[in-house]
A protein has these predicted regions:
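N-terminal assembly/interaction segments in proteins that build large macromolecular machines
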Residues: 11-186
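Single conserved hydrophobic/aromatic residue that forms the stacking wall/gate
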Residues: 1-6, 10
Length: 186
């Protein structure tokens, strides 16, 4: 039996762990109980649990999703990340993750494509793979980085259509940014 003061500390720990990890309340309680209240160890338990949950979801089909773009000067990236349902694709947490994927791809030396090697290399960049595991556990659906493409030119422009269902980047050499935007009819 816990004292009232101990119970309050425990509740605060559960709340803090939830805020840190985005994991569910019961998962946080279980992790804290398993680690006797050690927050760092509880985070590790949740990471392992998230990886196990992700492994179980790998056979599911993730056919919904969105595209996001990232632009820096004369380089642009469009990235597509899929989820199982359109409900999740509209989720702010998921959309922020997709933007993180696009930003990470932009900062990387990878050119993209749908081939597995570039996707695997991208996931190995800046802890993106760990973030994918975390978001899969938090959101509760299979998430997959489907593809990304990077373009470079004298001028680049980007466009997202249909709430993120279609993303376009265009690069032009010997042209201005205005000419690239005109080519996209912006």
């Amino acid at each position: 039996v816990r004292s009232s003061a101990a119970s309050d500390v425990y509740k605060r720990q559960v709340k803090e762990l939830r805020e840190m990890t985005g994991a569910g309340m019961m998962d946080c309680k279980k992790a804290l109980t398993e680690t006797n209240g050690d927050m760092d160890a509880a985070v590790d338990v949740l990471k392992k649990s998230g990886a196990a949950k992700m492994e179980k979801k790998q056979s599911r089909i993730a056919a919904e999703g969105i595209a996001r773009v990232a632009v820096n000067g004369n380089v642009a990236v469009v990235a597509e990340v899929n989820s199982e349902t359109d409900f999740v694709a509209k989720n702010e947490t998921f959309q922020e993750f997709v933007q993180t994927v696009a930003d990470t791809a932009l900062a990387s030396d990878l050119n993209g494509g749908a081939n597995g090697e570039d996707i695997e290399a991208l996931l190995a960049t800046n802890g993106l793979s760990d973030l994918l595991v975390e978001k899969t556990a938090t959101i509760g659906e299979k998430l997959s980085v489907r593809r990304f493409a990077k373009v470079t030119g004298d001028a680049v422009a980007s466009y997202i259509h249909g709430g993120g269902r279609i993303g376009v980047v265009i690069a032009a050499d010997g042209a201005s940014d205005d000419a690239a935007k005109e080519a996209l009819c912006l």
